[in-house]
Amino acid sequence: MPIVPKHFFERPTLELAEKLLGKIFVRRISDTIRLKGRIVETEAYCGEFDEASHAWRGKTTRNSMMFNSPGMLYVYLAYGSHYMLNIVSEPENIPGAVLIRAMEPIDGLMFMKEQRGTALATSLLSGPGKLTQAFAIRGDCNGKDLFNNEFFLENAQDIPQNAMGSGSRVGITKSRQLQWRKYILNNPHVSKARGS
């Protein structure tokens, strides 16, 4: 499959949250281990006018990656225990990022199961903390991009609007009315939050 180019990510965050659905996230662990997951659920965080966004109060050392080049990885530790994988959106210096909330495992399931300690395919990547654990994504991945041999996206057909659902974002206390969580309808790998 063709690799998704950099200009793909340089678009409004909410649009990117939809366009990422169906794309294949790839991490190359070694010459013999390649992990692949189809993105089935995302959340948009739209910068300085979104109270739930890390960038709402402006640029800081912690959130500076949200202001970086589109297609960069913004990885941070949430609740002191789970890493969150985000893909930077928008032109550089305009803050925005899309949280990858769930994936459908495609390749490298044995490695993923070892990382997660579970054999059930539908729960391997069905949450943001689960998928970072399965893909061995930690804080040292923050600032890497999707244009190298370790991380990249493979292109796939866009998900049509009638096959896409929207809902409120999970685990936030502000801007909860915004329907900025996007997911593929009827996909069993979407997180349990799909019904909200």
UniProtKB/Swiss-Prot annotation:
SUPFAM superfamilies: FMT C-terminal domain-like. It is an enzyme of class 3 (hydrolase). Keywords: DNA damage, DNA repair, Hydrolase. Its EC number is 3.2.2.-. Pfam families: Pur_DNA_glyco (PF02245). The keyword Thylakoid does not apply. GO terms for molecular function: alkylbase DNA N-glycosylase activity; DNA binding. The keyword Flavoprotein does not apply. It comes from the Bacteria. GO terms for biological process: base-excision repair. Belongs to the DNA glycosylase MPG family. PANTHER family: DNA-3-METHYLADENINE GLYCOSYLASE (PTHR10429:SF0). This is Putative 3-methyladenine DNA glycosylase. It comes from Chlorobium phaeobacteroides (strain DSM 266 / SMG 266 / 2430). The lineage of its organism: Bacteria, Pseudomonadati, Chlorobiota, Chlorobiia, Chlorobiales.
